[in-house]
């Protein structure tokens, strides 16, 4: 029996081979204990403040919105140690691993942001760290691979399947089912079997709590909308969490990749069906026959064919709205923010920003306040972007 | 009496262990798959465990994963897999046949439609690799309506509460895991302790089949000596398929020899 509800409506659950159930129960019990343990909580917040650098600022973008009546604030998770919101929850999970007396961390990563975070937390807590990463992602995120290795993590290249995050997830689960007695599987997003979606949300909810306090200080009111990108959905659920019961629009932005009509996207909430995969019942990109389909996004961090179960639930009860942004639109937002505000956003976060800009251009005279969760910084993406821009320039020259 | 029950009774009378081979339907093609399965049956398989190919088989190691991908590459449909099963059923009326697959395939097809299809094709059992007993209820109810045995996996570190749950739900046989991890051949020798097996037997009287890592006669004899009723062998057979993809005759010949050798190992008389 679980201590907490494993479901969000009909989504969630624990769909794993039987062998992993004791490890999930152990994790849930330790998580429930940790929530009640004031020493654990104090220590966690101490790491967040004095190691990771919380609270992160809420920045108003004046140049970006010039000539309109929209005010866009960025929740600056890019300024967190490690360069993304991922650091928050890995600190919590590493502390749980220590509490469970596990010696090793297994993790998987797409963009490398969670891999870097897992390597950071493992180094800090003296845990051995093994990170699974698709061979394609290793190529497109080489600076992050180097960072992980510098911090002592072993990066395992996954050659099977499509060689991206989906396959890295499978490999990590396989490793865990062999080594659960000594290893903790540090899932990087609010997805996977219970209790992961609940744990990750708990360890990311400070994003929303801080943002709420900060916007009330700066605007004296709540925003009209919170906008965040959604791959697995951890930064989005983190910033949504404290606004779910408020009168605020919650908007999740999925990657439309090369365009929904091309099939090369990563938007299971709008263009997938409910299914069972990666330990959970949630929305899923799948074929007519129920085989899991490959996803696509310019941003490796959003390149995942499923989504955390709480997002599927928020979508089903129409509490949050999920939209999609193409690679090209995200790239434009990436360049605009860099140029206008001197902030290079992660390609993931650029999707959220692109949607905010879209809303702003749609009705420039409307007075509205948005908070965009700038979930990570874009240093890791500059090479990808440079390559694409080079190709586009060549195309223009030849015209 | 169910086909499993009859088969286990017969083997117990003959003082033999049970040998169950596992292959993935459609690997390397539907046509070859049928030939392979017939070879397995003709050379001593007491029952069959057949895999329905899935894109992300996370309870399986690289050998079975590649087999699934080879099968999927041929774009055979879900229903074509069932046609093959029906084909075998019509030819071998008394042979227990089970399938192993992943939850999304069942869910996508509709749980009720799925079990109806199993019933129509003459299947005896279904094992869903990524559904633990805790999430089994919706599947179990309908499986029972169609008289399909639900097979449960018993890990080597199962505690009393899990053993008692398995004894309540399991039908046909219990799939005993040799070790933690995923399917595949590992160098470490595998044997389950007699004490653990006796403990399981206290909870129920269903036959026990040991799976994961079975590849040679010694392991089979050890398994039966420890108190199991037999073994399931998958990756070692699929390894033969993989190594002989373009040598059909050699592949069938090797499978034939391997199957006879492993079946023979189940025939030693227990003292």
UniProtKB/Swiss-Prot annotation, chain A:
The modification N6-(pyridoxal phosphate)lysine is found at residue 86. It comes from the Bacteria. Pathway: Amino-acid biosynthesis; L-tryptophan biosynthesis; L-tryptophan from chorismate: step 5/5. One of its GO terms (molecular function) is tryptophan synthase activity. Pfam families: PALP (PF00291). Its cofactor is pyridoxal 5'-phosphate. CDD domains: Trp-synth_B (cd06446). GO terms for cellular component: cytoplasm. Its EC number is 4.2.1.20. PROSITE patterns: TRP_SYNTHASE_BETA. It catalyses: (1S,2R)-1-C-(indol-3-yl)glycerol 3-phosphate + L-serine = D-glyceraldehyde 3-phosphate + L-tryptophan + H2O. It is an enzyme of class 4 (lyase). Keywords: Amino-acid biosynthesis, Aromatic amino acid biosynthesis, Lyase, Pyridoxal phosphate, Tryptophan biosynthesis. Tetramer of two alpha and two beta chains. The beta subunit is responsible for the synthesis of L-tryptophan from indole and L-serine. Belongs to the TrpB family. This is Tryptophan synthase beta chain.
Curated annotation (Swiss-Prot), chain B:
Keywords: Amino-acid biosynthesis, Aromatic amino acid biosynthesis, Lyase, Tryptophan biosynthesis. InterPro entries: Aldolase_TIM (IPR013785), RibuloseP-bd_barrel (IPR011060), Trp_synthase_alpha_AS (IPR018204), Trp_synthase_suA (IPR002028). It comes from the Bacteria. Its EC number is 4.2.1.20. It is an enzyme of class 4 (lyase). It catalyses: (1S,2R)-1-C-(indol-3-yl)glycerol 3-phosphate + L-serine = D-glyceraldehyde 3-phosphate + L-tryptophan + H2O. GO terms for molecular function: tryptophan synthase activity. Pathway: Amino-acid biosynthesis; L-tryptophan biosynthesis; L-tryptophan from chorismate: step 5/5. GO terms for cellular component: cytosol. The active site is at residues 49, 60. Pfam families: Trp_syntA. The alpha subunit is responsible for the aldol cleavage of indoleglycerol phosphate to indole and glyceraldehyde 3-phosphate. Belongs to the TrpA family. Tetramer of two alpha and two beta chains. PANTHER family: TRYPTOPHAN SYNTHASE ALPHA CHAIN, CHLOROPLASTIC (PTHR43406:SF1), TRYPTOPHAN SYNTHASE, ALPHA CHAIN (PTHR43406). This is Tryptophan synthase alpha chain. It comes from Buchnera aphidicola subsp. Schizaphis graminum (strain Sg).
